[in-house]
Amino acid sequence: MKKLLFAIPLVVPFYSHSAETVESCLAKPHTENSFTNVWKDDKTLDRYANYEGCLWNATGVVVCTGDETQCYGTWVPIGLAIPENEGGGSEGGGSEGGGSEGGGTKPPEYGDTPIPGYTYINPLDGTYPPGTEQNPANPNPSLEESQPLNTFMFQNNRFRNRQGALTVYTGTVTQGTDPVKTYYQYTPVSSKAMYDAYWNGKFRDCAFHSGFNEDPFVCEYQGQSSDLPQPPVNAGGGSGGGSGGGSEGGGSEGGGSEGGGSEGGGSGGGSGSGDFDYEKMANANKGAMTENADENALQSDAKGKLDSVATDYGAAIDGFIGDVSGLANGNGATGDFAGSNSQMAQVGDGDNSPLMNNFRQYLPSLPQSVECRPFVFGAGKPYEFSIDCDKINLFRGVFAFLLYVATFMYVFSTFANILRNKES
Protein backbone atom coordinates (compact mmCIF):
# COMPACT_ATOMS: atom_id res chain seq x y z
CA MET A 1 0.00 0.00 0.00
CA LYS A 2 2.86 2.35 0.88
CA LYS A 3 4.48 1.63 -2.49
CA LEU A 4 1.24 2.51 -4.23
CA LEU A 5 1.06 5.83 -2.35
CA PHE A 6 4.60 6.68 -3.43
CA ALA A 7 3.68 5.95 -7.05
CA ILE A 8 0.70 8.31 -7.09
CA PRO A 9 2.81 11.53 -7.46
CA LEU A 10 4.54 10.00 -10.46
CA VAL A 11 1.35 8.94 -12.18
CA VAL A 12 -0.70 12.07 -11.59
CA PRO A 13 1.65 14.52 -13.40
CA PHE A 14 1.96 12.15 -16.32
CA TYR A 15 -1.79 12.09 -16.82
CA SER A 16 -2.40 15.66 -15.67
CA HIS A 17 -3.33 16.70 -19.23
CA SER A 18 -5.55 13.77 -19.96
CA ALA A 19 -8.61 16.03 -19.76
CA GLU A 20 -7.65 17.54 -23.14
CA THR A 21 -8.62 15.80 -26.36
CA VAL A 22 -7.53 16.32 -29.93
CA GLU A 23 -10.80 18.05 -30.69
CA SER A 24 -10.56 20.37 -27.70
CA CYS A 25 -6.98 21.29 -28.59
CA LEU A 26 -7.81 22.06 -32.20
CA ALA A 27 -10.72 24.20 -31.05
CA LYS A 28 -8.43 26.53 -29.12
CA PRO A 29 -7.87 29.94 -30.76
CA HIS A 30 -4.55 31.00 -32.18
CA THR A 31 -2.45 33.09 -29.84
CA GLU A 32 0.25 35.63 -30.57
CA ASN A 33 2.52 35.15 -27.60
CA SER A 34 5.92 34.02 -26.32
CA PHE A 35 6.34 30.32 -25.38
CA THR A 36 9.21 28.83 -23.38
CA ASN A 37 10.77 25.36 -23.64
CA VAL A 38 10.46 25.47 -27.43
CA TRP A 39 12.09 22.79 -29.58
CA LYS A 40 12.73 22.63 -33.31
CA ASP A 41 12.25 19.81 -35.79
CA ASP A 42 15.65 19.23 -37.40
CA LYS A 43 14.19 18.43 -40.83
CA THR A 44 11.26 20.80 -41.27
CA LEU A 45 12.66 23.54 -38.97
CA ASP A 46 9.18 23.90 -37.45
CA ARG A 47 9.06 24.97 -33.79
CA TYR A 48 6.81 23.32 -31.21
CA ALA A 49 5.86 23.79 -27.57
CA ASN A 50 3.58 22.08 -25.05
CA TYR A 51 1.03 24.34 -23.41
CA GLU A 52 -2.11 23.49 -21.42
CA GLY A 53 -1.97 19.87 -22.49
CA CYS A 54 -1.81 20.68 -26.22
CA LEU A 55 0.93 20.74 -28.83
CA TRP A 56 1.41 24.16 -30.42
CA ASN A 57 3.18 25.02 -33.67
CA ALA A 58 4.80 28.44 -34.28
CA THR A 59 3.76 29.98 -37.60
CA GLY A 60 4.32 33.20 -39.44
CA VAL A 61 7.19 35.39 -38.27
CA VAL A 62 9.00 33.56 -35.47
CA VAL A 63 11.46 35.53 -33.31
CA CYS A 64 13.54 33.59 -30.77
CA THR A 65 16.16 34.24 -28.13
CA GLY A 66 19.78 33.32 -28.72
CA ASP A 67 19.40 29.72 -27.49
CA GLU A 68 16.10 29.35 -29.41
CA THR A 69 14.23 27.94 -26.39
CA GLN A 70 11.87 30.91 -26.09
CA CYS A 71 10.12 32.21 -29.19
CA TYR A 72 7.52 34.83 -30.00
CA GLY A 73 5.11 34.23 -32.85
CA THR A 74 1.61 33.14 -33.80
CA TRP A 75 1.05 29.77 -32.12
CA VAL A 76 -1.47 27.32 -33.58
CA PRO A 77 -2.72 24.22 -31.70
CA ILE A 78 -2.20 21.05 -33.74
CA GLY A 79 -2.89 18.19 -31.32
CA LEU A 80 -2.24 16.77 -27.90
CA ALA A 81 0.92 17.59 -25.99
CA ILE A 82 3.90 15.34 -26.66
CA PRO A 83 5.39 13.56 -23.61
CA GLU A 84 8.89 14.68 -22.70
CA ASN A 85 11.90 13.47 -24.73
CA GLU A 86 9.78 11.88 -27.47
CA GLY A 87 10.52 14.70 -29.93
CA GLY A 88 8.38 15.89 -32.80
CA GLY A 89 8.35 12.63 -34.72
CA SER A 90 5.45 10.82 -36.26
CA GLU A 91 4.96 8.63 -33.17
CA GLY A 92 4.60 11.58 -30.85
CA GLY A 93 2.50 13.78 -33.11
CA GLY A 94 0.30 11.17 -34.72
CA SER A 95 -1.96 12.25 -37.53
CA GLU A 96 -2.29 15.68 -35.98
CA GLY A 97 1.40 15.96 -35.20
CA GLY A 98 3.74 18.64 -36.27
CA GLY A 99 6.85 16.95 -37.58
CA SER A 100 8.38 14.43 -39.88
CA GLU A 101 10.06 11.33 -38.46
CA GLY A 102 12.19 11.78 -35.37
CA GLY A 103 12.68 15.49 -35.79
CA GLY A 104 14.39 17.02 -32.77
CA THR A 105 14.27 16.46 -29.03
CA LYS A 106 12.08 18.41 -26.65
CA PRO A 107 13.98 20.05 -23.79
CA PRO A 108 12.99 19.35 -20.18
CA GLU A 109 9.77 20.90 -18.95
CA TYR A 110 11.69 23.35 -16.77
CA GLY A 111 14.59 24.44 -18.94
CA ASP A 112 17.32 26.95 -18.28
CA THR A 113 16.70 30.68 -18.37
CA PRO A 114 16.79 31.82 -22.06
CA ILE A 115 19.78 33.85 -23.22
CA PRO A 116 18.72 37.26 -24.62
CA GLY A 117 18.97 37.29 -28.39
CA TYR A 118 20.01 40.07 -30.77
CA THR A 119 16.61 40.92 -32.16
CA TYR A 120 14.89 44.18 -32.98
CA ILE A 121 11.59 42.68 -31.86
CA ASN A 122 11.65 41.50 -28.25
CA PRO A 123 11.00 37.72 -28.44
CA LEU A 124 9.82 37.65 -24.81
CA ASP A 125 6.75 39.83 -25.28
CA GLY A 126 6.64 40.80 -28.97
CA THR A 127 7.10 44.51 -28.32
CA TYR A 128 8.68 46.76 -30.91
CA PRO A 129 9.59 50.47 -31.12
CA PRO A 130 6.60 52.80 -31.42
CA GLY A 131 5.90 54.80 -34.52
CA THR A 132 6.43 52.08 -37.10
CA GLU A 133 3.84 51.75 -39.85
CA GLN A 134 0.89 49.49 -39.07
CA ASN A 135 -1.44 47.55 -41.30
CA PRO A 136 -4.90 49.06 -41.98
CA ALA A 137 -7.76 47.66 -39.97
CA ASN A 138 -9.34 46.11 -43.06
CA PRO A 139 -8.02 42.52 -43.28
CA ASN A 140 -9.71 41.68 -46.58
CA PRO A 141 -7.38 40.63 -49.40
CA SER A 142 -7.28 42.48 -52.71
CA LEU A 143 -7.76 40.72 -56.04
CA GLU A 144 -5.68 41.84 -59.01
CA GLU A 145 -6.26 40.93 -62.65
CA SER A 146 -2.50 40.82 -63.23
CA GLN A 147 0.59 40.74 -61.07
CA PRO A 148 1.24 44.26 -59.74
CA LEU A 149 4.41 46.14 -60.60
CA ASN A 150 7.29 46.87 -58.23
CA THR A 151 6.82 43.88 -55.96
CA PHE A 152 9.66 42.31 -53.97
CA MET A 153 10.57 38.78 -52.90
CA PHE A 154 11.65 37.80 -49.39
CA GLN A 155 11.91 34.21 -48.11
CA ASN A 156 10.10 33.01 -51.25
CA ASN A 157 7.06 35.23 -50.59
CA ARG A 158 6.08 38.08 -52.89
CA PHE A 159 5.21 41.42 -51.24
CA ARG A 160 4.13 44.86 -52.32
CA ASN A 161 3.59 48.23 -50.68
CA ARG A 162 0.15 49.69 -51.29
CA GLN A 163 -0.60 53.10 -49.78
CA GLY A 164 1.60 52.47 -46.77
CA ALA A 165 0.38 48.92 -46.16
CA LEU A 166 2.21 45.70 -47.01
CA THR A 167 0.39 42.86 -48.73
CA VAL A 168 1.65 39.40 -49.62
CA TYR A 169 0.76 37.20 -52.59
CA THR A 170 -1.26 34.20 -51.35
CA GLY A 171 -2.19 32.48 -54.62
CA THR A 172 -4.78 32.77 -57.35
CA VAL A 173 -8.56 32.90 -56.97
CA THR A 174 -11.12 32.10 -59.65
CA GLN A 175 -14.52 33.79 -59.83
CA GLY A 176 -17.50 33.51 -62.10
CA THR A 177 -18.66 30.73 -64.37
CA ASP A 178 -18.94 32.18 -67.86
CA PRO A 179 -16.33 33.36 -68.27
CA VAL A 180 -14.15 32.14 -65.41
CA LYS A 181 -11.73 34.85 -64.31
CA THR A 182 -8.52 34.25 -62.41
CA TYR A 183 -7.27 36.88 -59.96
CA TYR A 184 -4.03 37.29 -58.03
CA GLN A 185 -4.79 37.52 -54.33
CA TYR A 186 -2.76 39.82 -52.08
CA THR A 187 -3.48 39.52 -48.35
CA PRO A 188 -2.63 42.29 -45.83
CA VAL A 189 0.45 41.62 -43.72
CA SER A 190 -0.13 41.82 -39.97
CA SER A 191 3.42 41.00 -38.89
CA LYS A 192 4.98 43.72 -36.75
CA ALA A 193 8.43 42.38 -37.55
CA MET A 194 7.81 42.61 -41.29
CA TYR A 195 6.77 46.26 -41.01
CA ASP A 196 9.74 47.03 -38.81
CA ALA A 197 12.18 45.55 -41.30
CA TYR A 198 10.53 47.27 -44.28
CA TRP A 199 10.31 50.79 -42.88
CA ASN A 200 13.72 50.69 -41.19
CA GLY A 201 15.58 49.79 -44.39
CA LYS A 202 16.60 46.27 -43.46
CA PHE A 203 15.80 44.94 -46.94
CA ARG A 204 18.79 45.68 -49.14
CA ASP A 205 17.74 47.85 -52.12
CA CYS A 206 14.13 46.64 -51.89
CA ALA A 207 12.25 48.82 -49.44
CA PHE A 208 11.89 51.78 -51.80
CA HIS A 209 11.99 51.53 -55.57
CA SER A 210 10.03 52.99 -58.45
CA GLY A 211 9.40 52.55 -62.13
CA PHE A 212 7.46 49.85 -63.95
CA ASN A 213 9.21 46.63 -63.03
CA GLU A 214 7.32 43.45 -63.83
CA ASP A 215 9.84 41.12 -62.23
CA PRO A 216 9.97 41.30 -58.44
CA PHE A 217 13.06 42.54 -56.63
CA VAL A 218 14.82 39.82 -54.66
CA CYS A 219 15.49 41.19 -51.18
CA GLU A 220 18.30 40.33 -48.82
CA TYR A 221 17.93 40.91 -45.09
CA GLN A 222 20.62 43.23 -43.76
CA GLY A 223 19.84 43.43 -40.05
CA GLN A 224 22.17 42.58 -37.19
CA SER A 225 24.47 39.56 -37.24
CA SER A 226 21.78 37.11 -36.43
CA ASP A 227 21.28 34.33 -33.96
CA LEU A 228 17.74 34.16 -35.29
CA PRO A 229 16.30 31.06 -36.94
CA GLN A 230 14.97 31.11 -40.47
CA PRO A 231 11.40 29.77 -40.37
CA PRO A 232 10.17 27.70 -43.31
CA VAL A 233 7.98 29.53 -45.79
CA ASN A 234 4.25 29.04 -45.15
CA ALA A 235 5.15 26.98 -42.08
CA GLY A 236 2.37 24.64 -41.14
CA GLY A 237 2.02 21.39 -39.30
CA GLY A 238 4.98 19.68 -40.96
CA SER A 239 5.14 16.85 -43.42
CA GLY A 240 3.45 14.48 -41.03
CA GLY A 241 0.65 16.89 -40.11
CA GLY A 242 -2.99 15.99 -40.42
CA SER A 243 -6.02 18.20 -40.63
CA GLY A 244 -5.08 20.23 -37.59
CA GLY A 245 -1.57 21.32 -38.60
CA GLY A 246 -1.95 21.27 -42.34
CA SER A 247 -4.99 23.46 -42.73
CA GLU A 248 -3.80 26.11 -40.33
CA GLY A 249 -0.26 26.16 -41.67
CA GLY A 250 -1.01 27.16 -45.23
CA GLY A 251 -3.52 29.93 -44.70
CA SER A 252 -2.98 33.63 -44.48
CA GLU A 253 -2.23 33.45 -40.76
CA GLY A 254 0.12 30.48 -40.95
CA GLY A 255 2.41 31.54 -43.71
CA GLY A 256 0.68 33.60 -46.36
CA SER A 257 0.61 36.99 -44.79
CA GLU A 258 3.19 36.29 -42.12
CA GLY A 259 5.42 33.75 -43.77
CA GLY A 260 7.88 36.27 -45.08
CA GLY A 261 8.78 38.04 -41.89
CA SER A 262 11.97 39.95 -41.69
CA GLU A 263 13.21 39.04 -38.24
CA GLY A 264 12.77 35.38 -38.92
CA GLY A 265 16.04 35.01 -40.70
CA GLY A 266 17.87 35.90 -43.82
CA SER A 267 21.55 36.03 -44.35
CA GLY A 268 22.23 38.55 -41.62
CA GLY A 269 25.02 39.93 -43.72
CA GLY A 270 25.87 43.47 -44.65
CA SER A 271 25.64 46.70 -42.78
CA GLY A 272 24.17 50.12 -43.46
CA SER A 273 22.29 50.90 -46.63
CA GLY A 274 24.76 49.56 -49.17
CA ASP A 275 26.78 52.72 -50.00
CA PHE A 276 28.49 52.53 -53.37
CA ASP A 277 32.29 52.90 -53.26
CA TYR A 278 32.93 55.03 -56.35
CA GLU A 279 36.68 55.35 -55.70
CA LYS A 280 37.12 51.60 -55.43
CA MET A 281 35.13 51.04 -58.61
CA ALA A 282 37.14 53.74 -60.44
CA ASN A 283 40.42 52.10 -59.44
CA ALA A 284 39.13 48.72 -60.56
CA ASN A 285 38.10 50.13 -63.95
CA LYS A 286 41.45 51.87 -64.33
CA GLY A 287 43.34 48.68 -63.61
CA ALA A 288 41.16 46.64 -65.96
CA MET A 289 40.94 49.06 -68.89
CA THR A 290 44.37 50.72 -69.01
CA GLU A 291 47.90 49.47 -69.36
CA ASN A 292 51.21 50.78 -68.13
CA ALA A 293 52.81 52.25 -71.23
CA ASP A 294 56.57 51.71 -71.59
CA GLU A 295 57.67 55.20 -72.58
CA ASN A 296 61.23 54.19 -73.38
CA ALA A 297 60.06 51.32 -75.56
CA LEU A 298 57.66 53.58 -77.47
CA GLN A 299 60.33 56.23 -78.04
CA SER A 300 62.90 53.65 -79.09
CA ASP A 301 60.48 52.05 -81.55
CA ALA A 302 59.49 55.41 -83.07
CA LYS A 303 63.13 56.53 -83.30
CA GLY A 304 64.14 53.28 -85.01
CA LYS A 305 61.42 53.65 -87.64
CA LEU A 306 62.27 57.31 -88.25
CA ASP A 307 65.98 56.51 -88.56
CA SER A 308 65.22 53.84 -91.14
CA VAL A 309 63.10 56.22 -93.19
CA ALA A 310 65.70 58.98 -92.87
CA THR A 311 68.47 56.62 -94.06
CA ASP A 312 66.52 55.67 -97.18
CA TYR A 313 65.72 59.24 -98.00
CA GLY A 314 69.28 60.29 -97.21
CA ALA A 315 70.68 57.80 -99.73
CA ALA A 316 68.32 59.04 -102.42
CA ILE A 317 69.13 62.66 -101.66
CA ASP A 318 72.88 62.00 -101.69
CA GLY A 319 72.58 60.51 -105.16
CA PHE A 320 70.54 63.45 -106.33
CA ILE A 321 73.01 65.95 -104.85
CA GLY A 322 75.88 64.17 -106.60
CA ASP A 323 74.09 64.46 -109.91
CA VAL A 324 73.38 68.15 -109.36
CA SER A 325 76.99 68.80 -108.26
CA GLY A 326 78.32 67.23 -111.39
CA LEU A 327 75.98 69.35 -113.44
CA ALA A 328 76.95 72.55 -111.59
CA ASN A 329 80.71 71.87 -111.72
CA GLY A 330 80.76 71.39 -115.48
CA ASN A 331 81.31 67.66 -115.27
CA GLY A 332 78.35 67.03 -117.50
CA ALA A 333 74.87 65.93 -116.72
CA THR A 334 74.79 62.49 -115.10
CA GLY A 335 72.23 60.39 -113.33
CA ASP A 336 68.83 61.99 -113.30
CA PHE A 337 70.09 64.80 -115.56
CA ALA A 338 71.76 62.67 -118.23
CA GLY A 339 68.91 63.34 -120.65
CA SER A 340 69.52 67.11 -120.58
CA ASN A 341 73.04 67.14 -122.11
CA SER A 342 71.84 68.18 -125.55
CA GLN A 343 69.75 71.02 -124.13
CA MET A 344 72.63 72.25 -121.96
CA ALA A 345 74.99 72.28 -124.94
CA GLN A 346 72.74 74.75 -126.69
CA VAL A 347 72.89 77.42 -123.98
CA GLY A 348 76.43 77.26 -122.76
CA ASP A 349 78.79 75.41 -120.51
CA GLY A 350 76.70 74.27 -117.60
CA ASP A 351 76.28 76.84 -114.86
CA ASN A 352 78.81 79.09 -116.52
CA SER A 353 76.34 79.81 -119.27
CA PRO A 354 76.28 83.47 -120.29
CA LEU A 355 72.55 83.23 -120.26
CA MET A 356 72.54 82.55 -116.54
CA ASN A 357 75.02 85.33 -115.87
CA ASN A 358 72.76 87.88 -117.53
CA PHE A 359 69.81 86.96 -115.35
CA ARG A 360 71.62 86.29 -112.07
CA GLN A 361 71.04 89.85 -110.91
CA TYR A 362 67.29 89.37 -111.14
CA LEU A 363 67.20 86.31 -108.89
CA PRO A 364 65.80 86.97 -105.40
CA SER A 365 67.95 86.78 -102.30
CA LEU A 366 68.08 83.43 -100.59
CA PRO A 367 65.90 83.15 -97.45
CA GLN A 368 67.61 83.16 -94.08
CA SER A 369 67.07 80.19 -91.83
CA VAL A 370 66.10 80.47 -88.15
CA GLU A 371 67.41 78.55 -85.17
CA CYS A 372 66.19 75.01 -85.10
CA ARG A 373 64.12 73.63 -82.23
CA PRO A 374 63.40 69.90 -81.79
CA PHE A 375 59.88 68.85 -82.78
CA VAL A 376 58.15 67.06 -79.88
CA PHE A 377 54.92 65.11 -80.48
CA GLY A 378 52.61 64.14 -77.60
CA ALA A 379 54.63 65.86 -74.87
CA GLY A 380 54.05 64.26 -71.48
CA LYS A 381 52.11 61.32 -72.94
CA PRO A 382 53.15 57.67 -72.93
CA TYR A 383 53.49 57.81 -76.74
CA GLU A 384 55.70 60.99 -76.79
CA PHE A 385 58.46 61.11 -79.37
CA SER A 386 60.63 63.88 -80.85
CA ILE A 387 62.55 64.70 -84.04
CA ASP A 388 66.04 66.06 -83.46
CA CYS A 389 67.38 69.22 -85.09
CA ASP A 390 69.95 67.36 -87.18
CA LYS A 391 67.18 65.58 -89.06
CA ILE A 392 65.09 68.75 -89.30
CA ASN A 393 68.03 70.74 -90.69
CA LEU A 394 68.78 67.97 -93.15
CA PHE A 395 65.20 68.02 -94.39
CA ARG A 396 65.15 71.81 -94.62
CA GLY A 397 68.41 71.89 -96.57
CA VAL A 398 67.32 69.22 -99.00
CA PHE A 399 63.89 70.76 -99.44
CA ALA A 400 65.39 74.20 -100.07
CA PHE A 401 67.84 72.75 -102.54
CA LEU A 402 65.03 70.99 -104.37
CA LEU A 403 63.12 74.24 -104.62
CA TYR A 404 66.15 75.99 -106.06
CA VAL A 405 66.80 73.21 -108.54
CA ALA A 406 63.16 73.17 -109.57
CA THR A 407 63.25 76.92 -110.06
CA PHE A 408 66.48 76.68 -112.01
CA MET A 409 65.13 73.96 -114.25
CA TYR A 410 61.92 75.88 -114.83
CA VAL A 411 63.81 79.05 -115.82
CA PHE A 412 66.30 77.07 -117.84
CA SER A 413 63.60 75.23 -119.75
CA THR A 414 61.72 78.44 -120.40
CA PHE A 415 64.66 80.22 -121.96
CA ALA A 416 65.76 77.12 -123.84
CA ASN A 417 62.35 76.94 -125.46
CA ILE A 418 62.60 80.62 -126.35
CA LEU A 419 65.97 80.09 -128.05
CA ARG A 420 64.79 77.05 -129.94
CA ASN A 421 61.75 78.90 -131.21
CA LYS A 422 63.99 81.77 -132.33
CA GLU A 423 66.31 79.49 -134.31
CA SER A 424 63.41 77.77 -136.01
Curated annotation (Swiss-Prot):
Task: Provide the residue span(s) of the region labelled Hinge.
Answer: 105-141
Biological process (GO) annotations?
adhesion receptor-mediated virion attachment to host cell; entry receptor-mediated virion attachment to host cell; viral extrusion; virion attachment to host cell pilus
Record-linked InterPro entries: Attachment_G3P_N, Attachment_G3P_N_sf, Phage_G3P_N2_sf
Residue span of region G1 (Gly-rich linker) = 86-104
Q: Where is this region: Disordered?
A: 83-147, 222-279
Cleaved signal peptide residues: 1-18
**SUPFAM superfamilies named among the record's database cross-references:** N-terminal domains of the minor coat protein g3p
Disulphide bridges: 25-54, 64-71, 206-219
Region called G2 (Gly-rich linker), residue ranges: 236-274
Query: Transmembrane region positions?
Result: 398-418
Gene3D superfamilies in the record, alphabetically?
Answer: Minor Coat Protein, Domain 2, Phage FD Coat Protein,Membrane penetration domain
- Compositional bias segments (type: Gly residues): 86-105, 235-273
Region: N2; residue ranges are 142-228
What biological function has been recorded for the protein in this entry? Plays essential roles both in the penetration of the viral genome into the bacterial host via pilus retraction and in the extrusion process. During the initial step of infection, G3P mediates adsorption of the phage to its primary receptor, the tip of host F-pilus. Attachment of the phage causes pilus retraction bringing the viral particle into close proximity of the host cell inner membrane.
Record protein name field: Attachment protein G3P
Taxonomic path: Viruses, Monodnaviria, Loebvirae, Hofneiviricota, Faserviricetes
Q: Which gene encodes it?
A: III
